[in-house]
């Protein structure tokens, strides 16, 4: 009983929500009701307001186990009516494509706003568990502005249950349409 109480006491939960940066231009209303406006190529490294580190769009979309460190660009394309294709490219990196299915709920276009959803297992020296990521994409030329919601539930050191959520705003420069 003491061990169960200790485990419950050590279990953790964290929530972090970063508001939209006031210094950035406001996100305009979508110009069209469809999401073809997002088709194009974007820089993989972006901006997180107030931070010197440059976030990776590839890492947010594909996870920490993806080749995000070598990525230089991300291409969004509506190759079919029922999916969004995301292709990652970089020097010395074989292009990697992932298809987000609209029918499976991995992608959604709602009045000109595109949302991509990914669920993946994560494992590291410290933690293992299930991660859910929802990325809302907004066009604010010359940037792709993303609102990334992450939720993870798992165990730390294979013993301590942990759950956390975060929401952050990033922006990535459009390279070419």
What are these regions (language model features)?
Residues 70-139, 171-176:
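Contiguous, well-ordered beta-strand patches that form the walls/edges
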Residues 13-73, 117, 129-130, 140-177:
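Amphipathic/hydrophobic helical signal segments and adjacent flexible N-terminal regions
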């Amino acid at each position: 009983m003491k061990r169960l109480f200790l485990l419950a006491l050590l279990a953790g939960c964290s929530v972090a929500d970063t508001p939209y940066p006031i210094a950035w231009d406001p996100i305009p209303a979508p110009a069209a009701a469809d999401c073809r406006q997002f088709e194009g190529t974007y820089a993989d490294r972006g901006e997180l307001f107030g931070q010197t580190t440059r976030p990776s769009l590839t890492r947010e979309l594909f996870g920490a186990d993806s080749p995000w460190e070598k990525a230089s660009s991300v291409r969004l394309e509506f190759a079919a009516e029922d999916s969004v294709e995301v292709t990652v490219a970089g020097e010395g990196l074989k292009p990697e494509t992932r298809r987000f299915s609209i029918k499976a709920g991995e992608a959604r276009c709602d009045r000109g706003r595109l949302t991509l959803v990914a669920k993946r297992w994560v494992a590291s020296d410290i933690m293992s568990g299930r991660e859910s990521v929802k990325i809302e994409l907004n066009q604010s030329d010359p940037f792709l502005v993303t609102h990334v919601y992450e939720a993870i539930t798992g165990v730390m050191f294979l013993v301590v249950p942990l759950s956390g959520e975060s929401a952050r705003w990033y922006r990535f420069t459009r390279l070419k349409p």
